[in-house]
């Protein structure tokens, strides 16, 4: 164990550092050809045509773990696979934050599950708003550092690229935060939309900053949202703690199988092509939206979506909905009283969206 490891484990709740968790029938490596240790049925269900569903699944399937580690550029022991990034967020908050004592810092407007998990844990929530200026939204790094130090935050969530605003945080700024908060907080960088970004992943920084945690998902670029496969990438000792806090069998066998197929060389080639097409469509859609008279502002985006301010966001939302086009209403979020978030679709879908918005302009006031 290296000299840095205690620093990471010291950030975990004291009673969980040596917590053994639940020892399931699959958590112990055993060999044999007659398995009678888990009270599973000896016969498959009639609906199980391949007779593969009667056994409990591997808690952390080695093949999928290796594939994800190769995809993200880390070691398999640095990966915890969970039910989407949502489970990773929840595990981190529960493992690190003492209720009513250890704060969680977020940067609104931002993905809501960080705050939800903090509230479920009864952890104080510290909010450092993003700054909206001529260049777009961006993180207020000095304010984040000051607030984290003053509040003694144990978890700092940074969404990059950020949902719903689309802004990515430069690596140098993230490294500044990591350097300043070493030993006092876990810095969690959510890269759910990383495949669409020009900013490189922060995963290589894990070698120098063991208090860095990275969240990744197969839901966005890899088009496997229903499979619910997310990854927590972190120091191996922290991953081991999180695994002990996780449910015994979190990953259904069909989901694991689909994820492995989705990470084959052929599938990754298709994914890369689609990401390139989405990035190109994102810029086409952004330019076209900016020309509409009812649009106040289209923010630059490093994700697969655009945040758009409208003169009349309600009219735009209702017109789109009436035409069968569903977008995300962001008007209840801080600083976004006039904004909608538009996912970048296929070229045909984007053209249809634009046609509806152009029709609004054509209607006399």
UniProtKB/Swiss-Prot annotation:
Homodimer. Its EC number is 2.6.1.9. It comes from the Bacteria. This is Histidinol-phosphate aminotransferase. It is an enzyme of class 2 (transferase). The modification N6-(pyridoxal phosphate)lysine is found at residue 220. The lineage of its organism: Bacteria, Pseudomonadati, Pseudomonadota, Gammaproteobacteria, Lysobacterales. InterPro entries: Aminotransferase_I/II_large, HisP_aminotrans, PyrdxlP-dep_Trfase, PyrdxlP-dep_Trfase_major, PyrdxlP-dep_Trfase_small. The keyword GTP-binding does not apply. GO terms for molecular function: histidinol-phosphate transaminase activity; pyridoxal phosphate binding. Its cofactor is pyridoxal 5'-phosphate. It comes from Xylella fastidiosa (strain M12). Pathway: Amino-acid biosynthesis; L-histidine biosynthesis; L-histidine from 5-phospho-alpha-D-ribose 1-diphosphate: step 7/9. GO terms for biological process: L-histidine biosynthetic process.
């Amino acid at each position: 164990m290296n000299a840095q490891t205690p620093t990471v484990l010291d950030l975990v709740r004291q009673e969980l550092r040596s917590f053994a968790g639940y020892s399931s029938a699959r958590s112990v490596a055993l060999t044999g050809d007659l398995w009678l240790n888990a009270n599973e049925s000896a016969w498959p269900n009639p609906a199980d045509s391949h007779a593969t569903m009667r056994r409990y699944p591997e808690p952390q399937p080695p093949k999928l773990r290796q594939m994800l580690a190769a995809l993200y550029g880390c070691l398999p022991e640095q990966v915890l696979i969970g039910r989407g990034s949502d489970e990773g967020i929840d595990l981190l908050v529960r493992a690190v934050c003492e209720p009513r004592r250890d704060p969680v810092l977020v940067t609104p407007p931002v993905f809501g599950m960080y705050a939800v998990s903090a509230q479920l844990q009864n952890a104080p929530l510290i909010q450092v708003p993003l700054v909206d200026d001529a260049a777009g939204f961006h993180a207020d790094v000095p304010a984040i550092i000051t607030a984290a130090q003053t509040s003694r935050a144990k978890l700092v969530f940074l969404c990059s690229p950020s949902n719903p605003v689309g802004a990515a945080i430069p690596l140098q700024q993230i490294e500044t935060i990591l350097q300043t908060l070493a030993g006092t907080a876990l810095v969690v960088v959510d890269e759910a939309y990383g495949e669409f970004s020009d900013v490189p992943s922060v995963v290589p920084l894990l070698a120098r900053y063991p208090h860095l945690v990275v969240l990744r998902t197969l839901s966005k670029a890899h088009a496997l949202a229903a499979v619910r496969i997310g990854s927590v990438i972190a120091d191996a000792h922290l991953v081991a703690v999180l695994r002990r806090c996780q449910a015994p069998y979190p990953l259904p066998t069909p989901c694991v199988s689909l994820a492995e197929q989705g990470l084959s060389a052929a599938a990754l080639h298709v994914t890369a092509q689609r990401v390139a097409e989405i990035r190109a469509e994102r810029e086409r859609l952004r330019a076209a939206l900016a020309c509409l008279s009812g649009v106040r502002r289209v923010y630059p985006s490093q994700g697969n979506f655009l945040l758009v301010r409208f003169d009349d966001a309600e009219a735009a939302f209702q017109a789109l909905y009436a035409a069968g086009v569903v977008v995300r209403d962001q008007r209840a979020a801080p600083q976004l009283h006039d904004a909608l978030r538009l996912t970048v679709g296929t070229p045909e879908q984007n053209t249809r969206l634009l046609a509806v918005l152009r029709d609004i302009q054509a209607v006399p006031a």
